[in-house]
């Protein structure tokens, strides 16, 4: 009854109006699962391959018909007949079928769509929520959200190099309250921006993209919004985080962090050592709890030096640096680079490998932050993954745009369903920092 009888993929659109995949898996019993695949704007060079058609006459070359065909004609044939509950065997079969180290033959987008749909079909077959199926009876921790309320870098036209300015309601008693705090700060920020005559249009991830005078202007404005909403900045209230996305403005030839790429003439050009000094300056000045991709993805010496300098005080998250890959994470753990990993399911391509990366991080005392991509869909699987793994943190955008809110609303449902068992750890989510 739990045997897979059909697998079907179609091309749909993501939140940026670009094509992506939706995959459906059916079983003998009638149980059904559907998975949709996200897509990134700033991508790590070591990420698994997102297969695009390259036909410029269709969707500007971004079509996904090849990946759709790979699901319908190759993957389907290979996994029909499997028990839908055998997630690892199915994921491993797809990895073997692809046969490349970066899923470049079938496409990580094709493989991931199937992987998610299989898990959802299994949960449907067993008549349990997805987070329960994935995590078992010990599932209980609601993640502390990183809310990206200001977008810069590659996610907007704002003249700021850092890609994301985030708030984290670390002092909230529950996820529901934390979400409310974030929404109220978001609206307070909008009022402040309007009063300054700044644009309140939102970027890819639902955050504002105003023409600030620089990084510190952005942080100061967020602090004013926190105060205006009636909250305090700090461990008992709301803390701040950055995604620097440094690889986006790192000049490989000159080996410098060239802020002029986004901030224009007269902006800073920093060496690796100066970049670390600058980040430390910001940490000393503001209530910052997390910094993602503070150094370029290939600047291993810089990462180690940054971790040595700030690793006990601030969460240092590797995104482009680790690309949700256990091979890179293992090296980071061994060399003392970063203290946290960003988990993006489409960077690696299967749920099995995603869970392995989270497990490896936790065993090494690293935190794991489950994350969306800038090109998202209404699929809320990452909310279930965050709870299933008790990851403790989620990064899924701002407090606007349905593609972001879908994940927050799913977490509200899960918190309700868990009832008294639910835990929201807030500041305790940063278990590897010395407070």
From Swiss-Prot:
It is an enzyme of class 4 (lyase). It catalyses: (2R)-2-phosphoglycerate = phosphoenolpyruvate + H2O. (2R)-2-phosphoglycerate binds at residues 163, 344, 373-374, 395. Disulfide bonds: none annotated. GO terms for cellular component: cell surface; extracellular region; peptidoglycan-based cell wall; phosphopyruvate hydratase complex. Its EC number is 4.2.1.11. Its main location: cytoplasm. Pathway: Carbohydrate degradation; glycolysis; pyruvate from D-glyceraldehyde 3-phosphate: step 4/5. CDD domains: enolase. One of its GO terms (molecular function) is phosphopyruvate hydratase activity. Mg(2+) binds at residues 243, 292, 319. InterPro entries: Enolase, Enolase-like_C_sf, Enolase-like_N, Enolase_C, Enolase_CS, Enolase_N. GO terms for biological process: glycolytic process. Its cofactor is Mg(2+). Catalyzes the reversible conversion of 2-phosphoglycerate (2-PG) into phosphoenolpyruvate (PEP). It is essential for the degradation of carbohydrates via glycolysis. Belongs to the enolase family. This is Enolase. It comes from Streptococcus equi subsp. zooepidemicus (strain MGCS10565).
């Amino acid at each position: 009854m739990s045997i897979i009888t059909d697998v079907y993929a179609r091309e749909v659109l993501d939140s940026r109006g670009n094509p992506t995949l939706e995959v459906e898996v059916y079983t003998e019993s009638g149980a059904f699962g559907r998975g949709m695949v996200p897509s990134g704007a700033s991508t790590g060079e070591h990420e698994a391959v997102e297969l695009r058609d390259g036909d410029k006459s269709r969707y500007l070359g971004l079509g996904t018909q090849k990946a759709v065909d790979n699901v319908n004609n190759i993957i389907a044939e290979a996994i029909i007949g499997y028990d839908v509950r055998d997630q690892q065997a199915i994921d491993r079969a797809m990895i073997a079928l692809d046969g490349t180290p970066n899923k470049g033959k079938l496409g990580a987008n094709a493989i991931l769509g199937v992987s998610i749909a299989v898990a959802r079909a299994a949960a449907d077959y067993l008549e349990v929520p997805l987070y329960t199926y994935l995590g078992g009876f010990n599932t209980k921790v609601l993640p502390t959200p990183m809310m990206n309320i200001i977008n810069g870098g590659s996610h907007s036209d704002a003249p700021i190099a850092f890609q994301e300015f985030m708030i984290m309601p670390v002092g909230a008693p529950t996820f529901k309250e934390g979400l409310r705090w974030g929404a109220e700060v978001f609206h307070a920020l909008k009022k402040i921006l309007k009063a300054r005559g700044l644009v309140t249009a939102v970027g890819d991830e639902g955050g504002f993209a105003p023409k600030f005078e620089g990084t510190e202007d952005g942080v100061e404005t967020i602090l004013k919004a926190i105060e205006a909403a009636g909250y305090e900045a700090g461990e008992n209230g709301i803390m701040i985080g950055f995604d620097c996305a440094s690889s986006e403005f790192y000049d490989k030839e000159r080996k410098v962090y060239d802020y002029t790429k986004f901030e224009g003439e007269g902006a800073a050009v920093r060496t690796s050592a100066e970049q670390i000094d600058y980040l430390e300056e910001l940490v000393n000045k503001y209530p910052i709890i997390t910094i993602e991709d503070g150094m370029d993805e290939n600047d291993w010496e810089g990462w180690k030096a940054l971790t040595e300098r700030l690793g006990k005080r601030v969460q240092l998250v590797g995104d482009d640096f680790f690309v949700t890959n256990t091979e890179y994470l293992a090296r980071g753990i061994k060399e003392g680079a970063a203290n946290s990993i960003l988990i993006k399911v489409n960077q690696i391509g299967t749920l099995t490998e995603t869970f392995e990366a989270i497990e490896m991080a936790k065993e090494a005392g690293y935190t794991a932050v489950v994350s969306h991509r800038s090109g998202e869909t209404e699929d809320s699987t990452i909310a279930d993954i965050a709870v299933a793994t008790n990851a403790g943190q989620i990064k899924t955008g701002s407090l606007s745009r349905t593609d972001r809110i879908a994940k927050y609303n799913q977490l509200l449902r899960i918190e309700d369903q868990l009832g008294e068992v639910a835990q929201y750890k807030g500041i305790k989510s940063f278990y590897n920092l010395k407070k």
